[in-house]
């Protein structure tokens, strides 16, 4: 009988301790940081990395912008939006292209596909895909 009483006492105290250690939802709040993709050469805080990424992306688009010859000659203009994702390995994958004609769309896609391999975005310590959209305005000024 003593062994049974001792066993019940141990079980009840361990259950009580387990409840105290668990706490409530307010004490167990989980916050996960989202880290944006990192362009080669960018570093610092998350804000600095994000600002550097945007600056480098703009610089990349401007330096790789090529107006297709045929569309330029025929004064074909338009706005093209390229949707893409930066995958978990840091490579760009085109997910969609809208606007403009095929020539303008191809030029915009080629520009985006020239983005170098990046350090992928992170969430909770794991690489994750980041979706993005970039508009291209093709104007001949003729």
For each feature predicted by the language model, list its residue ranges.
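N-terminal signal peptide c-region/cleavage motif recognized by signal peptidases
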Residues: 11-14
């Amino acid at each position: 009988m003593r062994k049974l009483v001792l066993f019940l006492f141990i079980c009840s105290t361990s259950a009580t301790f387990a409840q105290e250690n668990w706490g409530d939802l307010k004490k167990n709040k989980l916050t996960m940081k989202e880290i944006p993709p990192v362009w080669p050469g960018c570093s610092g805080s998350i804000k600095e990395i994000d600002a550097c990424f945007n600056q480098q992306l703009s610089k990349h688009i401007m330096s790789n912008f090529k107006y297709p010859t045929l569309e330029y000659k025929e004064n074909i203009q338009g706005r093209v939006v390229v949707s893409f994702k930066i995958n978990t390995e840091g490579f760009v994958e085109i997910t969609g292209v809208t606007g403009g004609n095929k020539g303008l769309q191809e030029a915009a896609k080629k520009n985006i596909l020239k983005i170098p391999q990046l350090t992928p975005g992170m969430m909770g310590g794991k690489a994750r895909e980041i979706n993005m959209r970039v508009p291209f305005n093709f104007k001949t000024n003729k």
